[in-house]
Each structure stands twice: as C-alpha cells, then as structure tokens.
C-alpha cells in the first residue's frame, strides 16, 4: 500500500477540508509476523467499527508498531488478512494515512508545500485549509527548521488530513513532545477526529494518553491481544476523572502483570517538612512512576 505515509507524493485529488467523511471499518484476522526466530505477532484478531478511536498499547517489543505497519501495508504479514468491509484494505489505500513520531517534513520545501505534496494545482488552497484546521494558518511560508517540535507535528497532521483520510493511523506521534504540547496535540487530534469522522488507530506507550483519546484500548502482550477494554467516557475528558483512573489502573495492572495496581498510601501526620526518613523527594507511587 504505497503512499500511505503522511509524506507521500503520489498525486491524488483532495476534497474540501470542510466535507464530512465516514470512517472505514477495519477487520484484522489471524495476523502473524515473524522476524528470524522471533514471533512478533501471533494470531492477532481485531475488529474496529467505522469512525471509532482505538489505542494500542503495550511494552516495548510487544509488536504494536509492527501491527500498525502491517495494517498500513508497509509490512507484509506472514499469515492473516486486513480487510475493510468486504474488500482488502489495500483496495482503499487512497483513504488511509499514517503519521509517525518523526514529522518527516522536507526541509527544502516551505510548510505549505510540504502539506500540498501530491495534490496538483489545487494543492495550495487545500493545504491552507488544512493548516488553518491545525492552528498554523499563518505559518505556511515558514521553513520546517523554523518550527518547534509541536508545530512540526501539526504540519504532519495537516499533511495527512488534507487527503481526507477515512482511516488515520498514528504511530506514537507525540512521543517526542513536552508534556504541555502533548496535551494540546491530544486535544487537537480529538477535535479533528470528532469533526471529520475518520477511523483512528493510535499506537502509544502512554496509558494516560490512550485513555484521554480513545474509546477503546487494546493491550498487546507477546504478540497477542491480552486485553481489550472500552473507555465509555464522553469527550472532552478532563485529566484525573475517576472513571479514567479506573481504566488506567486496569490497563496498567495487565501491563505490569499484577491483579491490582497499588493505591498510594494515605500520608501519615508529619511534624516536620520534607519527605519521610529514608525517602527522597523523587519517591512516588508505582502508578505515578509508570505514568
């Protein structure tokens, strides 16, 4: 499925950014992938409804990015199929876009020309609409080197959105950003997903991020689905909601291989300031250390 990455240069006709769309259904059946002696994916089955937002989380090396690349067609599964409706997803490649942690902007092209790649004569007008949608409408003539990390990721998101995707795949796109910029980007992604209606599949190592964005979290472990849990919390989601904390604890419990995530102990009365004897100011609860 060439041309799925957000930096693809394959020519296509863009539709107006204001047009609504319907997300693609996604069905993954029996996907297995092996590298040498290592079974990275071992019989993955997933079914994702149109316009759903699903987060895939797991420990490093569990196969989550490999699964996303198989869905995108950048890797070929040894066994199994990836379909959309009654047809292979490969037949819908123009409706699929993939965004990486690295924005992959062309440094010799201005921002607006990076977004307009492959769009033909109407590309600049469509690119301007996409930049407006991600809050960078005035930065079209800037060079990528003049942008912050968060701004470069906004450009990469605009470059994907300008093609009006029906399936948007995000491979840890916010992993290199600072905490506040991550929150801003999370809010932007949710806003655009709700506005445009595409199906969204996000790979992340951040459980809090998964629960902030997704309406379903899938945990991969040892190349298989270990947990599949709904997040029935309406958007917008404020950090610290008890319902989100409960879901995060459930997911973390699975990732840590425990039956229960320890709750922070209630502090005892202190007669002096500072941490208890034997502790340091950096000591935190197990849950906080993971997050």
Curated annotation (Swiss-Prot):
Q: Where is the composition biased (Polar residues)?
A: 281-291
Q: Where does it live in the cell?
A: Cell inner membrane
InterPro entries on file: AAA+_ATPase, ABC_transporter-like_ATP-bd, ABC_transporter-like_CS, ABC_transporter_ATP-bind, P-loop_NTPase
Role summary: Part of the ABC transporter complex SsuABC involved in aliphatic sulfonates import. Responsible for energy coupling to the transport system.
Organism name: Xanthomonas axonopodis pv. citri (strain 306)
Query: For ATP, which residues are the binding ones?
Result: 58-65
ABC transporter domain ranges (all copies): 26-247
Reactions accelerated catalytically: ATP + H2O + aliphatic sulfonate-[sulfonate-binding protein]Side 1 = ADP + phosphate + aliphatic sulfonateSide 2 + [sulfonate-binding protein]Side 1
Q: How does it assemble?
A: The complex is composed of two ATP-binding proteins (SsuB), two transmembrane proteins (SsuC) and a solute-binding protein (SsuA).
Q: Which UniProt keywords apply?
A: ATP-binding, Cell inner membrane, Cell membrane, Membrane, Nucleotide-binding, Translocase, Transport
Q: What is this protein called?
A: Aliphatic sulfonates import ATP-binding protein SsuB 2
The record's annotation in SMART domains points to: AAA
What domain of life? Bacteria
Q: Where does it sit, as one GO cellular component term?
A: plasma membrane
One Pfam match: ABC_tran
Q: Which family does it belong to?
A: Belongs to the ABC transporter superfamily. Aliphatic sulfonates importer (TC 3.A.1.17.2) family.
Q: According to its UniProt record, where is this protein mainly located?
A: membrane
Disordered: where is this region? 264-291
Q: Which residues form a coiled coil?
A: none
Q: Name one GO molecular function term.
A: ATP hydrolysis activity
Q: How does it sit in the membrane?
A: Peripheral membrane protein
**What EC number(s) does this enzyme carry?**
7.6.2.14
Q: Per UniProt, what is the name of the gene that codes for the protein in this document?
A: ssuB2
């Amino acid at each position: 499925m060439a041309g799925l990455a957000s930096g693809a240069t394959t020519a296509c006709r863009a539709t107006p950014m204001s047009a609504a769309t319907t997300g693609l259904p996604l069905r993954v059946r029996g996907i297995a992938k092996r590298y040498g002696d290592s079974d990275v994916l071992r019989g993955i089955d997933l079914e994702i409804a149109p316009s759903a937002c699903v987060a895939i989380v797991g420990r490093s090396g569990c196969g989550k990015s490999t699964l996303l690349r198989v869905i995108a067609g950048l890797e070929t599964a040894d066994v199994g199929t990836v379909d959309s409706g009654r047809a292979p997803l490969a037949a819908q490649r123009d409706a699929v876009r993939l965004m990486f942690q690295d924005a992959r902007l062309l440094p010799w092209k201005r921002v607006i020309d990076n977004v307009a790649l492959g769009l033909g004569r109407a590309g600049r007008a469509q690119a301007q609409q996409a930049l407006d949608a991600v809050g960078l409408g005035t930065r079209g003539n800037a060079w990528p080197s003049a942008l912050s990390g968060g701004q470069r990721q906004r450009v990469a998101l605009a470059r994907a959105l300008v093609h009006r995707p029906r399936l948007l795949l995000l491979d840890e796109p916010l992993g290199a950003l600072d905490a506040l910029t991550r929150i801003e980007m999370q809010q932007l992604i949710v806003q655009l997903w709700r506005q445009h209606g595409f199906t969204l599949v996000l790979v992340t190592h951040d459980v809090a991020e998964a629960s902030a964005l997704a309406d379903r979290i899938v945990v991969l472990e040892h190349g298989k689905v270990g947990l599949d849990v709904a997040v029935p919390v309406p958007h917008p989601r404020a950090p610290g909601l008890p319902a989100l904390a409960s879901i995060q604890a459930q997911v973390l419990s699975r990732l840590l291989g425990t039956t229960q995530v320890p709750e922070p102990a209630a502090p005892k009365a202190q007669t002096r300031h500072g941490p208890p004897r034997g502790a340091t100011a950096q000591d935190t609860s197990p849950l906080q250390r993971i997050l």
